[in-house]
Structures are given as structure tokens and as C-alpha cells.
Amino acid sequence: MFFFKEYKAKKVKAPDNFSNRERIMASKNKNLIFLLNKRFSWMKKYIKGKKTIIELGSGNGCIKKIIDGKKIILTDITKYPWIDKKVDMMKINLGKKYLKKVDVFIINHSLHHCANPALTLEKMSIYLKKNGYVLINEPETSFFLKLIQVLLDDESWSLKAKVFSRKNIFNPKSPWVSNTAVAQLLFKDNKKFQKHFPQYKIEKNKLSEFTVFLNSGGVNSSFFHIKLNWFFLKILNIFD
């Protein structure tokens, strides 16, 4: 099964962003903080000195746990109290104010929930400044991720999806429907990506986390973890 091209979760699981945000912002869990640092600290050099930074699909807004001093505009399809602007990733109607004015777009584990990721990339380029950045964290459809998704019936994947077609790759009936293979399909072949998106250049594409996430205690849900101190988290990170 884990070598199959597709897997469809039996139901769509919508996390409780209110309770998850409260838990994350108040958390002193070193495992979780270490994970969030891995996801966001690398972005700091790209946003340093930048004026307009917009995160798409912010969800519980956990980026502010790590990068709080910087004015990052949080957007989401749902207007939670901590969200600055309601934005649908498939439309990105930011208005004339932001045309060619955005220094940095941030997408953290939300692109695979977008039914038309190619269209999203296209629309971002309309607002992005020359030499601007799109910073992305996304799942990699590895053997172990597939195993976890099947065991937990957590999310779906499809390596058959035509992500460059500018057409919906799944029914966007809920913002939590997903295809965790999206980033792999978009970015694994640099030449193919460049052909479809000549306005972009992939500067860096690398794997980042595995066991650090599995033992974090959870971002969009809370789960069992073994508490570790910074020393052992750094050791674990070496093997990641």
C-alpha cells in the first residue's frame, strides 16, 4: 500500500485552531519549540529588513511563537481573531495596494491543502516584488509519511495529480482536504518547474524534519511525546 500512487483518507479532519493556538502560544514544551524553530528560524535571514511579509494559510498562527517581533501579515480562508486578513489561497485577492509590493510570501504546511497550487503560485507572482521570496515548508511523501497517514487515516496523497495544469486537483469542499504529495510533484524536477514557472527560481530545496516532528507533541493536534532537553533534541536533529 505504501508504494501505491494514491491514498484517500476516509474522512477530512479539521483541527481545533483555537485550542491548538492557545496550547502552542502558552507551551514550554521544548520538543515543540525545537520543531517550530526548525520550521521558522531559517526564514529570518530572508525577511530581515523587509517591509511587506504575508503568510498564506496561517491557520493557528504558530509562526508568531518564533517570529513575533516582525510584522508578518497573517492570512487565512477563515477569519480567526488573530488573522489580519481573510484570504483564499486560490484567489489571493490582496488588492491593488499589494501589487508588486510584497517582499516575502510564507507558506507553512498549507500548500497541500490548496486545490489549485499552480494557480496559487501564479497569483503570488502578481503581488511579489522583483527579487522577492516565497518561503515554503511542506511535507515530503516519504515511505514513513505514507505509513503514518494510513495508520492514522490522517491525510490523503496522490502522485498522479496534475499539479501544473492550473486546474483543481481535488474538490475544495473543505480547507482541510489535502494532497501531501503537492510539493514533491511541484518541486522535485527543477527543470520542469522552471518551464512552467519561468518567473520563479528555486534557490533551495531540502529535507528538514522527521523524528523531531514525530516527537514534538503536535502542532495541529496534541499527541504523546517523550520529553527531551535541548542537548538530546540536537542529537535527534543530527539523525533527522
Q: Which residue stretches match the model-derived regions?
A:
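Conserved N-terminal segment of class I S-adenosyl-L-methionine
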Residues: M1-K100
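Acceptor-substrate binding/catalytic loop of class I
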Residues: K173-N190
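A short glycine-rich, Lys/Arg-flanked "PGG" loop and its adjoining helix->strand segment in the class I
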Residues: L119-Y133
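Short catalytic micro-motifs in class I SAM-dependent methyltransferases
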Residues: H109-S110
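A conserved beta-strand element that flanks and buttresses the S-adenosyl-L-methionine
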Residues: I106
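Conserved class I S-adenosyl-L-methionine
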Residues: L135-N168
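A C-terminal cap/extension of S-adenosyl-L-methionine-dependent methyltransferases
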Residues: K191, K195-P198, I202-D240
